[in-house]
């Protein structure tokens, strides 16, 4: 059970991420946004996905967890669950409770596309998955560009080398 202080911190982080989305990302011309959450910041990003219309801008949602529970997209939004499944990567350490004890297995697509990593130490997980993350982001952006081109949309700007996105937590 979470303490009042932990709940207050979680809610404050969620509010900051929503504020950044509403006042920076949503009003920017950017069309290829990548959300990257690490540790406890993952909850705030999944909260954002469930509470704002992010699908037109966000090409990838990447979570790098420790042993904390995997945040879930809302159960009652089938179209969002499908989108999240297609656009997410959730990297978990080797001994994450999902794999060690089968926790959350019944949550299905609401978990995103989870990947059990060989790395056992959460603090070493991010450097271990950087190459896979970069390949996933590149594939997602290329797919979005191909879809836009097929639909007759004007080409978008060329991406800079994978630079940090505006909305990271």
Region spans (language model):
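Hydrolases whose catalytic domains are alpha/beta-hydrolase-1, hotdog thioesterase
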Residues: 43-48
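The feature captures the conserved acid-bearing segment of alpha/beta-hydrolase catalytic domains
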Residues: 50-155
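Gly/Ala-rich beta-loop-alpha elbow adjacent to hydrolase catalytic centers
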Residues: 36-42
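Intrinsic disorder/low-complexity signal
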Residues: 149-169
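Alpha/beta-hydrolase active-site loop
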Residues: 2-28
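Chromatin/DNA-recognition segments of nuclear transcriptional regulators
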Residues: 1-2, 38
């Amino acid at each position: 059970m979470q303490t009042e202080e932990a709940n207050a911190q979680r809610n404050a982080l969620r509010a900051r991420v929503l504020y950044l989305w509403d006042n920076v990302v949503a009003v920017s011309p950017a069309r290829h946004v990548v959300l990257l959450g690490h540790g406890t910041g993952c909850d705030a990003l999944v909260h954002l996905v469930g509470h704002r219309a992010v699908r037109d801008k966000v090409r990838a949602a990447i979570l790098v967890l420790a042993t904390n529970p995997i945040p879930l997209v809302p159960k009652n939004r089938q179209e969002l669950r499908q989108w999240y499944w297609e656009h997410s990567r959730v990297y978990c350490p080797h001994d994450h409770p999902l794999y060690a004890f089968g926790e959350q297995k019944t949550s299905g697509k609401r978990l995103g596309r989870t990947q059990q990593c060989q790395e056992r130490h959460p603090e070493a997980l991010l450097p271990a998955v950087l190459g896979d993350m970069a390949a996933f982001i590149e594939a997602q952006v290329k797919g979005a560009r191909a879809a836009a081109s097929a639909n007759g949309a004007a080409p978008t700007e060329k991406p800079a080398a994978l630079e940090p996105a505006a909305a990271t937590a």
